[in-house]
Amino acid sequence: MFIDIHAHAYRKAFFQAPGRRPWPNADQLIEFYDKHEVEKAVLLPLIGPEFYLPQSNEDILEAAERFPGRFIPFCNIHPQAIYNDPFSKLEDVFKQYRDAGCKGVGEVICNMSFFDPFMTNLFRAIEEMQWPMTIHVAHRYGRCYGIYDEPGLPGLAETLQRFPGMKVFAHSQTFWAEIAVLDTPHERAGYPKGKVIEGAVPKLMRKYENLYGDLSAGSGCNALTRDEEYAVKFLNEFQDKLMFGIDICSAPGEPHHVSLMNFLKKLLAEGKISQTVFNKIAKENAIRLLGL
């Protein structure tokens, strides 16, 4: 029924971030997916100093090999990789991971600007590969992870314009908060509530063919559930550009891990979205965009 467009797994589920349960391993994800009709998942390696505990692309490929047909591996390299040179041919590395089975890049969480020369070189290489890229957008520099952008998402907009051949799967609190006009810039750091007066995200999705919405994590679900009436319009209008995801960052089985799937099923049962719309968001868009 579902393809999870946004998943993480460590080789061993032992690392525990402050205030969190340990991160999942591949076996735990598969057990959860089997219970909840999740057929496949895009497995995203987490790299770089911005995150709790970096991992390797090879960990992801190993998990995909252990569970054939269940995990779709992405790869990830820091923009400063190879020679710490904004002109490095990062595509040379990507080609090797493509040959190993990777289908895209992400989750890109570098705490740098969209306009940083290292970032634009990364985007250039990804566009050359004709790959999608999953990104986390950040609201600030420091004590944070994700590509920094200002209110209104001008950096994302320019990136979409400059690299039209690069499909961007965007998510994060900062990104999804901008489904609506912001009351204050600080709302980008969390999960704003209340009625949606249309903000930057739907406008960018209309303008740029290469922008897609990764609905994973509490941020994607909150963007919909904060205003169900607007969510129905949004899901119907952008039915070809939205993808179901969970983003499990702890031992699977917490209530919020099923919030989005339950919300989509509710809208389907109430006739607010059609079976066609449900199927596209649940898995068909992922199949089409990843060439599965």
Model-derived regions, located:
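Catalytic pocket-lining loop regions of alpha/beta-barrel enzymes
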Residues: 104, 119-244
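Active-site-proximal loop/turn and secondary-structure-junction residues that shape catalytic pockets
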Residues: 47-48, 77-79, 111, 139-141, ...
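Active-site gating/metal-coordination segments in enzymes
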Residues: 39-40, 50-151
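Mobile, glycine- and charge-enriched loop segments
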Residues: 1-20, 57-86, 201-202, 209-212
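Active-site neighborhood of phospho(di)ester-bond hydrolases with catalytic His/Asp-centered motifs
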Residues: 2-5, 42-45, 74-76, 106, ...
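Alpha-helical scaffolding within the catalytic cores
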Residues: 23-30, 53-63, 88-92, 152-157, ...
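Conserved, mostly hydrophobic/aromatic
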Residues: 6, 33, 60, 97, ...
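Mid-to-C-terminal alpha-helical segments outside catalytic/metal-binding sites
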Residues: 1-40, 239-243, 249-292
